[in-house]
Structure formats: structure tokens, C-alpha cells
């Protein structure tokens, strides 16, 4: 006699329970946890940099940079004078709730209004694991194509916000902005969409205003 155990399902269930506990902990401590996801090179770090330029003097912010290896992004972000830690995943392509909790506690979450997790660059794995975040953000860049929401459904289903980035190169790519929005809303009718260019700053103010209002509402 033997018993079959669906390991993957069990892992997800355990993580989801842990994520809900972490979300409650963040709520109790007034910490808004933002999980930023995208493919490699979509502009997570540059978008985060532009966000910090606008918000770092208006709230207490801490950043967790998750990568398989290296500390390139952490060095870039730390130059903005905010609390920054580097999380090495040891080959894993995502963070889960327990890893996120470790990062938050190491960073000293009690003194923060906004904690940002820049997840590992990947459109698949990070979407599968709830980090305990208050809100999830996906960044989709113009060069990637307007069909990505159809090809990677879960990423866009779990996100509260989608930033369509690199709008400055729109004339050079076969990218239909309205079609992209249609594809995003097909996967997630409730998604908030911003057209931005982290390089030029286009649309970043609107994004930051939304985020600041969400943080304030979370802390009430």
C-alpha cells in the first residue's frame, strides 16, 4: 500500500497560509508591501528608481532586491538613501512568503510605511507564489510585445497594477497599446494600467500618486 501526495499543491497551500499571516502582520504594523514583477530587462529597477525620486521624502521606504546572484540592483537603489537589502535566492526563480518575511524582519519593517520587493525577473514562477504582498505590480515593456498577457496569463491575473513601460520606443516596435490593454483586461478586468517611461519619467507621477494614496489608505 502507498499514498500519493500532490506535493506541488501542498507547497502552494502552505505558502498561501503563510502569506495571509504575513499580510495580517503587515497590516497590524502599518506596512504596505508592494511586490514588483516582470521579465528580465523590463525596467523594474529603473522604474523603482524614478518612484523613489518622488516618494522617498514623503514616506519611510525600504527595498528588498531579489536576484539569483549579484548585488547590482541593490547598489543602484541604495544610492537613493533608502534602506536596502539584497536577497539571494540560491538558484530559485521566485520568492515565497517565508523568504519575504525574512527580508522584512532583517530590514526592520516596524519603521517603514512602504516596503518594496523587486522580485526575480521571470514571468512565470513569481506569479505562482503569494509573497504576502498588499499589492502586486507587473511591468510589461513595449519591446516584449502586446501579446504577453495572453501568453503568461497568471502573471496578469494576480496583478493589481500593470505598468506598460518604455513608451519612448513605441515608434520602433509593432506594439499596439490599446490591444495590450485589451489583453490585460481580458485576463484581469480589475487591473489598473499606467503607460510609463522610466527613462524619461513619462507617466511616473500618475503611478506614484496612485501608490501614495494606496499606502495612506492601507495605514488607516
Q: Where in this protein do the model-derived segments appear?
A:
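Helix-rich effector regions associated with P-loop NTPase G domains
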Residues: 110-114, 143-146, 150-154, 158-161, ...
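Cofactor-binding loop segments of dinucleotide-utilizing enzymes, especially the Rossmann-like FAD-
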Residues: 66, 141-142, 198
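Short beta->alpha connector loops at strand-helix junctions that form conserved
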Residues: 86-89, 140, 165
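Conserved Switch II/interswitch segment of TRAFAC-class P-loop GTPases
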Residues: 122-125, 132-150, 160, 167-174
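Short, glycine/polar-rich helix-capping loops at beta-to-alpha or helix-loop-helix junctions
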Residues: 70-74, 148-152, 176-182
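Nucleotide-state-sensitive switch-loop elements of NTP-binding domains
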Residues: 2-24, 28-37, 42, 46, ...
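Canonical P-loop GTPase G-domain recognition
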Residues: 170-220
